Amino acid sequence: MTDIHQHLWPPAFIDALRARAEAPRLDGWRLVLPDERPYSIDPSDHDPARRAAAAAAEGDERICISPAASLGLDRLDPAVAAELAEAWLDGALALGAPFAAWAMAGVLEPDAAALRDALDRGALGLELAADVLAAPDALERLAPLLEVLDNEGAALLVHPGPAGAQDDPGRPGWWAPVVPYVSQLHAAWWAWADGGRERFPDLPVCFAALAGLGPLHGERQRARGGDSGAVDPLTFVETSCYGTLAVDAVIRVLGVDVICHGTDRPYCDAAPLALGEAALNAIKIRNPGRLLARHPDKVPT
């Protein structure tokens, strides 16, 4: 089985975050992000042996890790973002099995050569912030990166970007994951639907957290003049932080063949899904395998 959405920071990446004088940075085990309340990190959450043991106990044989686009590292000065991307990938690849790594990239000056090198070194694909993909000019601005993925058949993981000032201290701790993160994913889902597949026909893309339940709004989109209809076999969603009710609802819209298993550990644990054996096999084994196979359009569903 494959979990396509976890976060585990290797030592080199932790050191790089601690070396920063400005947010986003780590102060010891205290995460400081621009305009957001500080967040205390449990060191054991980034212990590779502990994480691997937990995965093995649940039957996960491959754990796909990313730094988390919600840190906002992609929008730093391009040279700084590139250094952090290198520190991330060096450390993540050094972990070895059962871990596999998503690359990160700066978005102010997208570097196609650096992404191509990351894929050559073993990165699964690219983690991209949902708020970046949702921007009106995103497909044009991100074209250097998306073209690399499209040509290689390598996957794009769309993950929430920073909550920023919406993570107000007066709000409960669950506010950012439930409100700004979900709304970003919802917007990114429909931004991709509006021309993404036409421009990048071979790019497999997976939206975290069921794309903020964006797929459930197809009826409304069509009622307002849209033309969403046929399911795109290369546009996937993963299940992190959702249970049977939401997953079943999305399956009714998209079918089971584009639903992938993801947990968002260490921030969520996998909710047991009350689905049939065939559906669980598709979600946990077949679909992640197809997503992460280069050129999944050539892999039978």
Feature-to-residue mapping (PLM):
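Mid-domain alpha/beta scaffold segments of enzyme catalytic cores
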Residues: 1-132, 140
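Mid-to-C-terminal alpha-helical segments outside catalytic/metal-binding sites
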Residues: 2-4, 10-62, 90-91, 212-213, ...
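Flexible, glycine- and charge-enriched loops at secondary-structure boundaries
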Residues: 41, 78-85, 178, 182, ...
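A short acidic (Asp/Glu
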Residues: 75-76, 217-220, 272
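Secondary-structure boundary/capping positions in well-ordered alpha/beta enzyme cores
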Residues: 98-99, 203, 257, 295
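Short beta->alpha linker loops
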Residues: 105-107, 209, 241-242, 283
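Short glycine-enriched loops at secondary-structure junctions
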Residues: 107, 160-164, 266-267
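Catalytic pocket-lining loop regions of alpha/beta-barrel enzymes
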Residues: 120-254, 258-260
